Amino acid sequence: MIPRLLPFFASLLFAALLFPGDIPPGIRNTVCLMQQGHCRLFMCRSGERKGDICSDPWNRCCVPYSVKDRR
């Protein structure tokens, strides 16, 4: 029974290492600042679009419309 479970647990470990999960705290704020944005509570100001979430709960990254997407 153990030899049959070994490949299963090995594949779970591989998946956990391949997809590490969420970004560590504080990094999201830095990413927002690198996009020339500001972390704001709930809503963005006029002339800003809503981006990704920031490290603090409920905060969103607000990026000005003048900054073009680099994708």
Curated annotation (Swiss-Prot):
One of its GO terms (cellular component) is acrosomal vesicle. One of its GO terms (biological process) is antifungal humoral response. Keywords: Antibiotic, Antimicrobial, Defensin, Disulfide bond, Secreted, Signal. Disulfide bonds join C32-C61, C39-C54, C44-C62. InterPro entries: Defensin_beta-like, Sperm_Ag_11A_B. Pfam families: Defensin_beta. It is found in: Secreted. Residues 1-19 form the signal peptide. SUPFAM superfamilies: Defensin-like. PANTHER family: SPERM-ASSOCIATED ANTIGEN 11A (PTHR14081:SF3), SPERM-ASSOCIATED ANTIGEN 11A-RELATED-RELATED (PTHR14081). Belongs to the beta-defensin family. Has antimicrobial activity against E.coli. Plays a role in the defense response in the male reproductive tract, contributing to sperm maturation, storage and protection. This is Sperm-associated antigen 11A.
